[in-house]
């Protein structure tokens, strides 16, 4: 413990401004006053264990959680894609590919459809010209101009209808990229504090046009949740007691299965009929809160974290030592 007043102690420190103070490269080393929690963070990142941090607001819990992403390997990151299901349109298929390939697959598929659409348009145009020529010859022989006009109207309508149907059917074959990653990216850090069920667990958007050829395919309306976006990374939830018990139970299921299907969360929405295959969500959960908040957690969820992870009580104050005073200077810098 340092008894010397801060003003006198600062006179013994040789620097002109905080720009001269060296800053650690890693985020975990920039956290001050939480040495024990920093050690646990390193272990949890290495062992891929869940964590529950208990402490007052403003004690560095979210910063410690974000620091885990720098300590985790990024070799296994994946893109998650959603495909149309020919057998059941309300159960879209889910596939994963290495990070960076999903965007390329979608672009390649769009290019293939563009080329196919051009070939189809040329074929339809050739057929339309043949039919138009036949109508013209028939009109010349019969001398009835109304027959030609009526035939051309039917021909134009049929051409546009067939072309639009083919284009819409082709577009529905393009997969949707639910979770996009890039090669070399750090593992994701997703802060899901205060999110609703749809944002946390995923949702299916409502389709106002559900028939008549104007409907949107189910796989295009699927939206990934925070648990899916955190696949391969860290999911941070502060004040976890604010989640309803049903949402905490679903979160526990996702942690256990490492995959969770996406379904419509609103009973009055057309998306309620849609439920995808299980979507990968292998994440590290870092939950946080104060003592009162933790007491209102789902018992099974807390038991899972304590049994297969770490429960840490973060410090609310730090000792007045010379080392900690230097760390405060670094924090200001």
Language-model-detected regions and their locations in the chain:
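Conserved ASCE/P-loop NTPase catalytic core
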Residues: 1-322, 331-333
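FAD cofactor-binding and catalytic pocket of flavoenzymes
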Residues: 327
């Amino acid at each position: 413990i340092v008894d010397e007043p801060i003003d006198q102690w600062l006179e013994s420190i040789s620097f002109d401004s905080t720009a001269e103070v060296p800053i650690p490269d890693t985020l975990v080393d920039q956290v001050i006053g939480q040495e024990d929690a920093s050690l646990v963070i390193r272990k949890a990142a290495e062992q891929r264990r869940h964590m529950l941090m208990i402490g007052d607001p403003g004690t560095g819990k979210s910063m410690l959680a974000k620091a885990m992403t720098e300590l985790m390997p990024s070799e296994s990151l994946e893109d998650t894609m959603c495909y149309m299901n020919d057998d059941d349109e309300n159960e879209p298929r889910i596939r994963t590919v290495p990070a960076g390939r999903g965007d390329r697959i979608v672009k390649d598929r769009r290019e293939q459809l563009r080329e196919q659409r051009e070939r189809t348009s040329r074929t339809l145009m050739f057929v339309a010209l043949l039919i138009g020529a036949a109508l013209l010859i028939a009109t010349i022989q019969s001398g009835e101009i109304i027959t030609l006009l009526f035939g051309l109207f039917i021909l134009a309508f049929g051409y546009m209808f067939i072309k639009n149907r083919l284009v819409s059917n082709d577009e529905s074959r393009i997969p949707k990229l639910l979770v996009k990653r890039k090669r070399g990216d750090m593992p994701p850090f997703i802060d899901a504090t205060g999110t609703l069920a749809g944002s946390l667990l995923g949702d299916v958007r409502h389709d106002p046009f559900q028939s008549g050829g104007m409907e949107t395919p189910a796989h295009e309306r699927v939206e990934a949740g925070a648990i899916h976006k955190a696949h391969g990374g860290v999911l941070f939830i502060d004040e976890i007691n604010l989640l309803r018990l049903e949402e905490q139970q679903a979160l526990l299921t996702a942690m256990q299965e490492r995959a969770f299907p996406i379904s419509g969360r609103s009973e009055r929405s057309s998306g309620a009929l849609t439920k995808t295959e299980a979507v990968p969500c292998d994440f590290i959960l870092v939950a946080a809160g104060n003592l009162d908040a933790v007491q209102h957690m789902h018992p099974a969820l807390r038991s899972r974290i304590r049994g297969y992870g770490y429960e840490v009580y973060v410090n609310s104050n730090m000792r007045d030592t010379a080392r900690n005073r230097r760390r405060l200077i670094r924090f200001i810098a």
